Amino acid sequence: MAVPRNRHSNARKNIRRSHHAKKARHAAVCNNCKQAFIPHTICTSCGFYNGKAVMTVEKK
């Protein structure tokens, strides 16, 4: 099995892991109700997806 020859310092480890952070998700705007929602999902405020009513949403 492969074993590292030398120890990696904490700084070197953190530099390598600098790209592992979570990225913020982008928001799209619903064409029906103009609310922000996550792309490729049903709009949670009106229930539309791709211009079609997919589910009914109860108004509060």
From Swiss-Prot:
Question: What are the protein's UniProt keywords?
Answer: Ribonucleoprotein, Ribosomal protein
The record ties this protein, via InterPro entries, to:
Ribosomal_bL32, Ribosomal_bL32_bact, Ribosomal_zn-bd
Reply yes or no: does the keyword Transport apply. no
GO cellular component terms attached to this protein's record: large ribosomal subunit
Locate the region Disordered.
1-23
Question: Superkingdom of the source?
Answer: Bacteria
Cite the GO molecular-function annotations of the record.
Answer: structural constituent of ribosome
GO biological processes: translation
Cell membrane is among the record's keywords: no
In terms of NCBIfam families, this protein maps to: rpmF_bact
Give the similarity note.
Answer: Belongs to the bacterial ribosomal protein bL32 family.
Q: What is this protein called?
A: Large ribosomal subunit protein bL32
Instruction: Specify the species.
Output: Chlamydia caviae (strain ATCC VR-813 / DSM 19441 / 03DC25 / GPIC) (Chlamydophila caviae)
